[in-house]
Amino acid sequence: MTVKEASRLTGISIRTLQYYDKLGLLPAMRTESGYRLYDDAALERLQQILLFRELEFPLRDIRTILDNPNFDRRKALRQQIELLTLKKQHLEDLIQLARTLQAAGEHTMQFKEFDTSRIDEYTRRAK
C-alpha cells in the first residue's frame, strides 16, 4: 500500500506518516523509485500507534512500547488511564464552573477548577 493509500485509509496525513517513518516509529519499505510502501504488518503497527496517540502517549513512549517486547504495557496503560481519569475530572470541574457561571449570569470567585497540580504531580511520579 502506498503512503497516499495508507493516508486515505487511516485519515492520517501523508506528512505525519513520513514523520513517523523519519522517527523510526513506522518504517516503510521503499520502491526502487524511493516511494514508501506499507504492508499489513506496518498497518497493524500504525493501528497500535494511533491507539496509543489517542490515549495521549508521547511518540517516544509509543516507540518504546512497540519495540521492546519486555516493556510492561499493562503498567503503562494503567498509568495512562489514571492520568486520563485525572484530566477527565479536571474537564468535568471546568464544565461545572461554566454551567454555574451560565446559570448565575455573573462572576464567581472560584479557582479550584484551574488547578492542574494533581495532574502535574501524577505525571511527574509516573515517569
What are these regions (language model features)?
Residues 1-67:
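Basic helix-turn-helix/winged-helix DNA-binding cores
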Residues 50, 62-124:
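Short, charged amphipathic alpha-helical surface segments
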